[in-house]
A protein has these predicted regions:
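Metallocofactor- and cofactor-centric catalytic cores in central/energy metabolism, strongly enriched
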Residues: 1-125
């Protein structure tokens, strides 16, 4: 299936002569021309080994990526930080909890904008 990417953010990194350097980076990561021609869908997780609520997110992201591929998109997985209240509470770490939510939102937005992804699947613990 051929997609019209002319109005999608990923057009800046996938269409035309100006995006040749960008496409070379995608090819270096193993993407084929067919993958680059599809919408790019960011799959963001807060996977880490800090708490049980995040430990399975890497596996869940693999399932989400399969779903994106089956729906005709090209998944691009990335992670962000997390501060788990269950561990951060009751000591100085509790000051990091609320601030971490802004950092998470900012880092996901910056990745989406910086890499011109067209859509997002977000997974958090």
């Amino acid at each position: 299936m051929k997609f019209d990417k002319s109005k999608l953010p990923s057009r800046y990194v996938s269409i035309g002569v100006k995006s040749a350097p960008h496409r070379s980076m995608y090819h270096a990561m193993g993407l084929k021309n067919e993958d680059i021609e599809k919408p790019f869908v960011g799959v963001a997780t807060t996977w880490n080994e800090a708490a049980p609520c995040n430990i399975t997110l890497s596996r869940q992201a693999q399932s989400a990526k399969k779903g994106v591929k089956n729906a005709g998109g090209t998944p691009r997985e990335f992670t962000t930080i997390t501060v788990t209240d269950g561990i951060a509470m009751g000591h100085a770490g509790m000051k990091a909890s609320l601030i971490s939510r802004e950092v998470i939102a900012d880092s996901v937005e910056l990745t989406m904008r910086g890499h011109c992804y067209d859509a997002l699947v977000g997974l958090a613990g």
